[in-house]
Amino acid sequence: MRIQDQLNHANVNDENMAFYRAIGVDDLTVYPPPFGAPDGLHTRAEMADYLKGVRKQAESHGLRFTNIALGGPDEITMARPERDAKIEEWCDVLRAMGDAGVPTLGYNFKPIGNFRT
């Protein structure tokens, strides 16, 4: 059995990774990574460098960096005019993951949010 937990990109640091390892976490998810936001990373190279850095840091603590989690951009799910640019950015995320050796992506497809009854 393997234990996986997630860290917000703002909390990716040696202290948290050492804690995760100490409590028996094996695999790490970063949710959300700093991609796509106005002040975030946008190019494939920027994203790959970030992911490689997290992977190296995780491995130095005996963790495997196995996953990032993202929400589907509204521009894609709602077929907005900026859709094609967001699809290309999404593809660059996947390419950057491949460049960095991050094997899986978790995502939510919720074009109109959550419903509760």
Regions found by a protein language model. Give the residues of each.
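N-terminal pre-domain/capping segments
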Residues: 1-117
